[in-house]
Amino acid sequence: MVRNLKIAIPNKGRLQQPTLQFLQSVGIKPLASDDRALIVPTSWEGVQLVMIRTEDIPNIVETGATELGITGHDYVIESSADVEELIKLDFGRSKIVLAVPQTWRENSVDELKGKEFRVATKYYNIAKEYVRRRELNAKVVKISGAAEVMPSLGAAEAIIDVMSTGTTLKLHGLKAIDVIMDSYAVVIGNRNWIKNDEADRINLLLTMMKGAIAAKGKKMIFMNVPDNKLDGVINSLPAMLAPAITRLSRSDIWEVITVAEEDILPEVIAKVKAAGARDIVVIDIEKVVK
């Protein structure tokens, strides 16, 4: 019987939906009949999703309870878990910032030197290291809820928290004066995953994930080209779009296949059509496996 591989993913929050969408692009779709289920079978036989708090995922993966996990780079750093970041994903981008009241005259962290203040944060370890490194006279107050409201409540004067656009900070009368680190979603694994009995299956999962990432934003273009137009069509393609060329059963027609980024697709189609290509078909690419 095949042992289930487990992937820990966020059970809620800003990373949950992008994570599920990414996994579906890989071909891993949850099959839970109950939204409250915490261990969920998937469309990929032998692969289960485990719904866990985002901040707990690094520690869970470190123990080996799940083979892989998807979480934020910020939580990997905060947890100090002994895990390996295997794939950097293209969602969940944010910054961890130091924010202070807009009424403060200080606009940089250097201007805070010598000033006593409290800073509320759920990133306790990151904050402690930051305060030490920047030689600030600040007391770190650990919280688990919304940091933005803490200055208004009088629980702290400043916060260290995640920022995507800065809108929430402004809404609460705060301004970011320093970026502590950039964050993004990552696929993580136990340091010993390569020694795992299921290493081949794990590696296949990672390969398919990388393939889905590589395919994002790319389109495959098929076109028929008369023999006397072939050179013109080939020369009209951007240099990076090296095409595959096959002579069809009609000896005077060639099939040309190429791949283009979605943002230059209209330009490519216009050029090849003007050069003599016809019967142009464009399809999505699900994965590019290298």
UniProtKB/Swiss-Prot annotation:
<comment type="similarity">
    <text>Belongs to the ATP phosphoribosyltransferase family. Long subfamily.</text>
</comment>
<dbReference type="InterPro" id="IPR013820">
    <property type="entry name" value="ATP_PRibTrfase_cat"/>
</dbReference>
<protein>
    <recommendedName>
        <fullName>ATP phosphoribosyltransferase</fullName>
        <ecNumber>2.4.2.17</ecNumber>
    </recommendedName>
</protein>
<dbReference type="Pfam" id="PF08029">
    <property type="entry name" value="HisG_C"/>
</dbReference>
<dbReference type="InterPro" id="IPR018198">
    <property type="entry name" value="ATP_PRibTrfase_CS"/>
</dbReference>
<dbReference type="InterPro" id="IPR020621">
    <property type="entry name" value="ATP-PRT_HisG_long"/>
</dbReference>
<keyword id="KW-0808">Transferase</keyword>
<dbReference type="GO" id="GO:0005524">
    <property type="term" value="F:ATP binding"/>
</dbReference>
<keyword id="KW-0460">Magnesium</keyword>
<dbReference type="InterPro" id="IPR015867">
    <property type="entry name" value="N-reg_PII/ATP_PRibTrfase_C"/>
</dbReference>
<keyword id="KW-0067">ATP-binding</keyword>
<dbReference type="Pfam" id="PF01634">
    <property type="entry name" value="HisG"/>
</dbReference>
<dbReference type="InterPro" id="IPR001348">
    <property type="entry name" value="ATP_PRibTrfase_HisG"/>
</dbReference>
<dbReference type="GO" id="GO:0000287">
    <property type="term" value="F:magnesium ion binding"/>
</dbReference>
<comment type="pathway">
    <text>Amino-acid biosynthesis; L-histidine biosynthesis; L-histidine from 5-phospho-alpha-D-ribose 1-diphosphate: step 1/9.</text>
</comment>
<dbReference type="GO" id="GO:0003879">
    <property type="term" value="F:ATP phosphoribosyltransferase activity"/>
</dbReference>
<dbReference type="GO" id="GO:0000105">
    <property type="term" value="P:L-histidine biosynthetic process"/>
</dbReference>
<keyword id="KW-0368">Histidine biosynthesis</keyword>
<keyword id="KW-0479">Metal-binding</keyword>
<keyword id="KW-0963">Cytoplasm</keyword>
<dbReference type="InterPro" id="IPR011322">
    <property type="entry name" value="N-reg_PII-like_a/b"/>
</dbReference>
<keyword id="KW-0547">Nucleotide-binding</keyword>
<dbReference type="InterPro" id="IPR013115">
    <property type="entry name" value="HisG_C"/>
</dbReference>
<comment type="function">
    <text>Catalyzes the condensation of ATP and 5-phosphoribose 1-diphosphate to form N'-(5'-phosphoribosyl)-ATP (PR-ATP). Has a crucial role in the pathway because the rate of histidine biosynthesis seems to be controlled primarily by regulation of HisG enzymatic activity.</text>
</comment>
<keyword id="KW-0028">Amino-acid biosynthesis</keyword>
<dbReference type="GO" id="GO:0005737">
    <property type="term" value="C:cytoplasm"/>
</dbReference>
<keyword id="KW-0328">Glycosyltransferase</keyword>
